[in-house]
């Protein structure tokens, strides 16, 4: 009977040693995994924008993004004719419009125009949408705003260290030209401002008149995302509006 008790006691102690041994191995592994996860969640969001911005400087040696978008831009020459229609506007005045069915509206990610500011040495492909591919190859219209000629706010984004670096030289009175396949539009810069990235009063997407707003990260020599944005505001000077009604 004593022998049985001793044997049982040995089994119990052996069992405790096995459990302690497993705990000694498993607990440090779990602790390391938790520590890694916490550090990852804490630091990756901070470094990602910087890494992405630094990558912009080496983009020539990276993947070719030029084949990842559709180009529907066919410049309108001086001798070409864009189909138009004459109608009365809200004031009863005769006005010429670009026929709606002659406009090839861009899909998200399409290159559909060119944005030029001669005084700022800005000449960039204009995309509909402001995703990474668009901003690596030009500047992009926020998809929640409007295309030129549609009579609303055109909100255009570009990187401060590439295509929109020249905005630092923007001044009141300078002209901005946007070329599309259905017409060319001229805007005049009316104001510039530095505002917080979270300031929703910096733009009005519900405006019932055509206006152009261009923006980029600020300061211009900063890498990655910043807490400020540099805005350039412009009014429409010339260009045939699009007839919003189907023809």
PLM regions: where:
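Conserved small/polar residues in nucleotide/adenosyl-binding loops
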Residues: 1-4
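Solvent-exposed, non-transmembrane regions of membrane-associated and secreted proteins
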Residues: 8, 15-247
């Amino acid at each position: 009977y004593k022998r049985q008790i001793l044997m049982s006691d040995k089994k119990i102690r052996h069992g405790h040693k096995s459990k302690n041994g497993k705990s000694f191995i498993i607990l440090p592994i779990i602790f390391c995994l938790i520590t890694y996860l916490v550090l990852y969640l804490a630091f990756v969001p901070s470094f990602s924008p910087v890494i992405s911005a630094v990558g912009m400087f080496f983009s020539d040696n990276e993947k070719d993004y030029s084949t990842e978008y559709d180009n529907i831009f066919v410049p309108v020459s001086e001798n070409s004719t864009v189909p138009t229609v004459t109608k009365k506007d809200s004031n009863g005045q005769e006005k010429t419009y670009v026929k709606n069915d002659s406009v090839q509206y861009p899909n998200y990610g399409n290159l559909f125009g060119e944005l030029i500011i001669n005084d700022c040495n800005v000449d960039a492909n204009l995309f509909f949408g402001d995703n990474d591919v668009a901003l690596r190859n030009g500047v992009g219209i926020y998809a929640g705003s409007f295309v030129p000629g549609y009579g609303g706010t055109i909100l255009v984004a570009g990187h401060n260290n590439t295509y929109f670096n020249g905005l630092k030289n923007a001044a009141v009175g300078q002209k901005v030209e946007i070329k599309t396949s259905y017409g060319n539009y001229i805007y005049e810069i009316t104001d510039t401002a530095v505002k917080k990235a979270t300031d929703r009063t910096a733009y009005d997407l519900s405006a019932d008149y055509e206006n152009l707003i261009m923006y980029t990260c600020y300061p211009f020599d900063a890498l990655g995302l910043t807490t400020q944005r540099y805005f350039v505001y412009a009014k429409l000077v010339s260009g045939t509006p699009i007839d919003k009604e189907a023809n």
